[in-house]
Amino acid sequence: MNYLNHFLNNRLKIKKESKYSLIIGETPSKGARSPKLWNRVYKAQKSKIRMYPADVSKNNINNLLRFLKNEKNYLGGSVTAPYKVLIMKYLDNIDKNAKKIGSVNTIVKNKNKLSGFNTDFFGSLEAIKKIKKQKKILILGAGGAARPVILSLTKKFKNSEFIFYNRNSNKIKNLAKELEIKNNFKIIKNLKHILNIKDFSLVVNTTSVGFDSWVKKNKELFNLKFFTPFSNLIKIKKIKSKNQSKFINKNKELLMTDRMNIKKFFLNRPNIEFLDIIYNPKKTKLLKIAEFYGNKIYNGLEMNLTQAIKSFMIVNKSNSYNFIKKKMINNG
């Protein structure tokens, strides 16, 4: 089993004959919730199977999957940011719903073949269940995590206008084409233009900005929990160790700009609803500020739980939705 570690940036201790599942991503060991949720169910079932976080570099994904295809004890598992789109080209089969959404968050191994599925769509439907009719919706981000959220929103709010904030307009156009979005939508690349639009009724953050996790890039670290999606993260300054005060001090100017952008955004904007698909922390900086200004907020916990239940069912061939949900929530 030690051979698995050749492809990872973290070290896993898995017994030689133990069946296991993985959550594959850049740094799932730094805060992914799925291992805790899945392992609660495995323990309740008195199973020896466990889920582990697999931190993988982009250039090692193909090698890892080739190894897992021939790894008899690997069952499948989850895929998290930022590989939900990239990983598709290395899989043998893609479920038709995942193909339409254009991203994969679940892998199932059958014999020596790996198949991709997407359960984020079900999670997205759960996340927006309490959100009522909307006139104009602002979507922040257009990555793999955004796709199922956008699909569920455009299906529920068919008469709403959508504003996409993303620096790459072609990415949005391709996404709209692939998801067959019929809604009226605009693309805004400039943050200043977003700050000047007054009549949003719902703001949805599908980016990872706000997530509490130390990320390593070129031997240096940064954490996105201190920022909102209104930050210019191109200017972020990294540090050599997980020193929170040092990181904040080094990014004073960026944090100040972020604060000014937030203040401008919330000025004269009452009664906006905010959905942030991030679940760690429960209240991101964006949600805390939105709540402070008296707006209704929703986090990504329900979305994350629902997708985890559905993924567990697919990988482990189980139909016990209520049992799995109960064990994931109650830890017993």
Identify the meaning behind each predicted range.
Residues 2-132:
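Phosphate/diphosphate ligand-binding glycine-rich loop within oxidoreductases
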Residues 25, 118-121, 128-129, 134-156, ...:
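Glycine-rich adenosine-cofactor-binding loop
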Residues 1, 7, 44, 300-332:
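C-terminal helix-to-coil terminal segments
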Residues 155-161, 292-296:
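Conserved S-adenosyl-L-methionine
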Residues 79-86, 144-145, 207-212, 280, ...:
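Short glycine-rich anion-binding loops that position phosphate/pyrophosphate groups of nucleotides
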Residues 183-297:
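Rossmann-like adenosine-cofactor binding region
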Residues 29-30, 169-170, 281:
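Helix N-cap at the beta1-alpha1 junction of Rossmann-like dinucleotide-binding domains, i.e.
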Residues 126, 275, 279-286, 293-318:
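Active-site capping/gating segments
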